[in-house]
Curated annotation (Swiss-Prot):
Keyword entries, A-Z: Chaperone, Cytoplasm, DNA replication, Metal-binding, Repeat, Stress response, Zinc, Zinc-finger
InterPro entries noted in UniProt: DnaJ, DnaJ_C, DnaJ_domain, DnaJ_domain_CS, HSP40/DnaJ_pept-bd, HSP_DnaJ_Cys-rich_dom, HSP_DnaJ_Cys-rich_dom_sf, J_dom_sf
Cofactor requirement: Zn(2+)
Source species of the chain: Leptospira biflexa serovar Patoc (strain Patoc 1 / ATCC 23582 / Paris)
Protein name as catalogued: Chaperone protein DnaJ
Residues where Zn(2+) 2 binds: C172, C175, C194, C197
Function: Participates actively in the response to hyperosmotic and heat shock by preventing the aggregation of stress-denatured proteins and by disaggregating proteins, also in an autonomous, DnaK-independent fashion. Unfolded proteins bind initially to DnaJ; upon interaction with the DnaJ-bound protein, DnaK hydrolyzes its bound ATP, resulting in the formation of a stable complex. GrpE releases ADP from DnaK; ATP binding to DnaK triggers the release of the substrate protein, thus completing the reaction cycle.
Cofactor note (record): Binds 2 Zn(2+) ions per monomer.
Matches recorded under PROSITE patterns: DNAJ_1, DNAJ_2, ZF_CR
Record localization: Cytoplasm
PANTHER family cross-referenced by the UniProt entry: CHAPERONE PROTEIN DNAJ, DNAJ HOMOLOG 1, MITOCHONDRIAL-RELATED
Sequence intervals crossing the membrane: none
Length: 375
């Protein structure tokens, strides 16, 4: 073993973080692993050297002792560093490097001791997501929708066992029903998915023809779901137990319905408020009056227009907006007024407007289309 310092061996600074130390060791372990460098004594020594350094620097107490006293401070309590009989939890280092383990151990499924394929025994089914387009009216008032979803359900022919009628699955002889096997080679001791049963813990000699041994078949089911008043785009509604059936008799997952509110031709939604534009005549803007305004529930609301109303003026109709989801009360409806200017006037209307202008002291009536003059 060389006399190089542990930080130098891993190629990191003395102030390196735990993640930096782990990453540096991972690269060296992959590069110099004996199974990838068979017969290369130098690579084997570098692998041992890197592992010894990592064993010390990964442990806060050992690292502190090393920083204060060097290797002597570590060896005094550890009995002399890393040897062939020492064991390191490589799954902690390589968590997502199942493909590398497959190369070292000749296949058999990815993952370290925390990974692996599907375990034996009952498992919860997968959750499902369904995107539902909802009209603004339904979002405001609430409505029951009927949706159709594809999902995996327990096979009715084999009742989920995966075996044909008259037969049953048997315990996998390779993993004894655990779904995983432990393999040791060189310095590694790794748990991987059992290649024979693919992690199920059982083997099926005569698979069910309907589900081909999976125990699940795809079905289309109609689900009734109540859309509550007040939902908005992105609201997620949970329907418990309406996801996919669980393998090996496990519980079903859940269904999540995500609402998307469609654009409305009249109303604009802002939170729980509604915005609507309403046009009025010039005479009503000047003299005032009363107009009918549509509401989201299909009814009409009488709105009084005061004298001198300007274009762009906003009137609030309190409590005529969208209900608050899961709470009490509603938002408001805001009416934006647009004053329409007549483009054509009758002779009588023109005379009245000219008289109005004279009373106001305005000079009007140049007539005709506008002209541009350039000097």
């Amino acid at each position: 073993m060389s006399d190089r310092g542990y930080y130098e061996v891993l190629g990191v600074s003395k102030g390196a973080s735990d993640d930096e130390i782990k990453s540096a060791y991972r690269k060296l372990a992959i590069k110099y692993h004996p199974d990838k460098n068979k017969g290369d004594k130098e690579a084997e020594e570098k692998f041992k050297e890197a592992t010894e350094a990592y064993e010390v620097l990964r442990d806060p107490q050992k690292r502190q002792a090393y920083d204060q006293f060097g290797k002597a401070g570590v060896n005094a309590g550890a009995g002399g560093g890393y040897g062939a009989g020492a064991y390191t939890d490589f799954s902690d280092i390589f968590g997502d490097f199942g493909d590398i383990f497959s190369e070292f151990f000749g296949g058999g499924g990815g993952g370290g001791s925390r990974g692996g394929g599907r375990r034996s025994g009952p498992q919860r089914g997968s959750d499902l997501r369904y995107n539902l387009e909802v009209s603004l009216e339904d979002a405001a008032l609430g409505k029951e929708y009927k949706i159709e979803i594809p999902r995996l359900e327990t096979c009715v022919d084999c009742t989920g066992s995966g075996a044909s009628k008259g037969s049953s699955p048997t315990v996998c002889p390779d993993c004894s029903g655990t779904g995983q096997v432990r393999r040791t080679q060189g310095f590694f001791s790794v748990t991987t998915t059992c290649p024979r049963c693919k992690g199920k813990g059982k083997v099926i000699s005569n698979p069910c023809k309907t589900c081909k041994g999976e125990g699940l078949t795809e079905k289309r089911r109609t689900i009734h779901i109540k859309i509550p008043a007040g939902v908005e785009s992105g609201s997620r509604l949970k329907v418990s137990g309406e996801g996919e059936s669980g393998p090996n008799g496990g519980p079903s997952g859940d269904l999540y319905v995500v609402t998307h509110i469609k654009k409305h031709p009249v109303f604009e939604r802002q939170g729980n408020d509604l915005i609507v534009q309403k046009s009025i005549s010039l005479s009503m803007a000047c003299l005032g009056g009363e107009i009918e305004v549509p509401s989201i529930d299909g009814k009409t609301i009488q709105l009084k227009i005061p004298e001198g109303t300007e274009s762009g003026q906003i009137f609030r109709l309190k409590g005529h907006g969208i209900p608050y989801l899961g709470s009490y009360g509603k938002g408001d409806q805001h009416v934006i007024i647009k004053v329409e200017i007549p483009k054509k006037l009758s002779k009588k209307q023109k005379e009245l407007m000219e008289e109005f202008a004279r009373e106001s002291g305005e000079k009007v009536g140049s007539g005709g289309k506008s002209k541009l003059f350039f000097r």
